[in-house]
Amino acid sequence: MTSSSGSLKLEIHTDDKTPGKWSVPLGDDVFRRFLSGGGGSEKAVFGEGSLFSPFLFGKYFDPSDAFPLWEFEAEVLLASLRSLGQCRVDWSQTDQAYVLKSDIPVVGKNNVQVYVDINGRVMEISGQWNSNKKAATNSDWRSGRWWEHGYVRRLELPSDADAKYSEAFLSNNDDYSFLEIRIPKINSKNKF
């Protein structure tokens, strides 16, 4: 993983008013069928060690459901992936901030977006990886079988996270983009 120096600063949106977004859950059996029938792009986006893999946390967890990431230590939750050299994500916290770092596979046009809900309690990282497939009836790819078109990871933010001062950076190379998100703590004197 690289650092945020020389990176593009992403806008963190708070105005996403998409009704029905992520309303179709990605079940374990559906995901396994999808991944087994997919090619390299699907495996790059959703494969082991990816931030968007439903199996990132050791057991199946739909990435469109909010996960309380910072309640867990990365060293513990990701130990088996790290021992196999398959981990492409890390998170930590300091006295000042919560930090998330992740490699994101470059498949097609990489259009990573970061949203924080209006209450500042859930952060959403998403993007469209397959813009060639047309959504059958939905104009917004996130309202149907979203995994066929894009990816998402929703994270519950800790109660002392000051989401309105969050920063996100994206840097690119040939195979992966590197995403770094920093969320200051409410009582931190060092807002970004």
Curated annotation (Swiss-Prot):
CDD domains: ACD_ScHsp26_like. One of its GO terms (cellular component) is cytoplasm. It comes from the Eukaryota. The keyword Cytoplasm applies. It is found in: Cytoplasm. Keywords: Cytoplasm, Stress response. InterPro entries: A-crystallin/Hsp20_dom, HSP20-like_chaperone. Gene3D superfamilies: 2.60.40.790. Residues 80-192 form the sHSP domain. Signal peptide: none annotated. Pfam families: HSP20. May form oligomeric structures. Belongs to the small heat shock protein (HSP20) family. This is 21.7 kDa class VI heat shock protein.
